[in-house]
Amino acid sequence: MSAKKVLFITQDVPESNLALIGQNLPQAIQDKGREIRTFMPKWGIVNERRNQLHEVIRLSGMNLIIDDTDHPLIIKVASIQAARRQVYFIDNDDYFQHRQMTCDENGKEYEDNGERAIFYARGVLETVKKLRWCPDVIHCHGWMSAM
């Protein structure tokens, strides 16, 4: 019997309790012998150099239409060597780059949070289709990752 495939979609980076669960749960799932793919937005606070992110050209290059506007979908990946796991990052300059997660530095929510969530969800689904990978279970962790 083949290993169950789990798609783990999270919104946070390790700065909160929710993010710590989002970091540890995929590892526990993998340690149980499941095949897992983890996705998260490439927030502006994620350091590409320190985390050794690189663009996956074969997965990038598509545009997603949100509210009648084309937005380029950029896919980046980082390997967690000690965990033998990869994390895919959904990136877009308008929605994620140079921004905090859901609120600005003054605590005010971004007006386009709904659009950002739609872009993220569609970006994950389109990327999984391009990977030709069909999960048995989809786990959405946090409201931004809700499908």
Task: Please describe what each predicted stretch is.
Residues 2-15, 40-42:
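Nucleotide-activated donor-dependent transferases that construct or modify glycoconjugates
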Residues 141-144:
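Short His-centered aromatic/hydrophobic patch
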Residues 38, 42-130:
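A conserved catalytic-core segment of Leloir-type glycosyltransferases
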Residues 24-34:
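A short, Lys/Arg-enriched amphipathic alpha-helix followed by its capping loop at the start of a domain
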Residues 34-36, 87, 135:
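Hydrophobic anchor at the start of a short beta-strand
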Residues 11-21, 47-49:
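A short, glycine/small-residue-rich beta-strand->loop->alpha-helix junction that serves as a flexible
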Residues 5, 136-137:
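Structural motif
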